[in-house]
């Protein structure tokens, strides 16, 4: 806050908020994904996803161009605001960061794509001599299973990733 170049700073709309809950961006938010990025591939090759957030900081928009000029990719953004939600380095095996909490949308039988990518990248790094699926391949396999997996007495609305009771 008292530095000359605050690349990461508190969200402008949050600066004047005080009291219960404080100055946080909370809850479910849509994230627009950039095509052909690792985040886009891990999260199902879709234009946008709904993710859960609990943060108060952002990349100061005046630094975005200089960061992207050096190779950083902001692959997930707030749809109608200059808030960067996911970033990655494309030339790294798995350098991906998010403001979201993937743990809030991950389930034991339906792991969130960013977690799958992390585990697959760690396995590949730990066992380079084994033929293991990479982060994207692992997420794609699980997404295929998710779209066909049904629990007894339930059906899955794949678009919303929500289970509903059969009538």
How should each PLM-predicted stretch be described?
Residues 1-167:
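Amide-donor transfer/coupling interface in amidating biosynthetic enzymes
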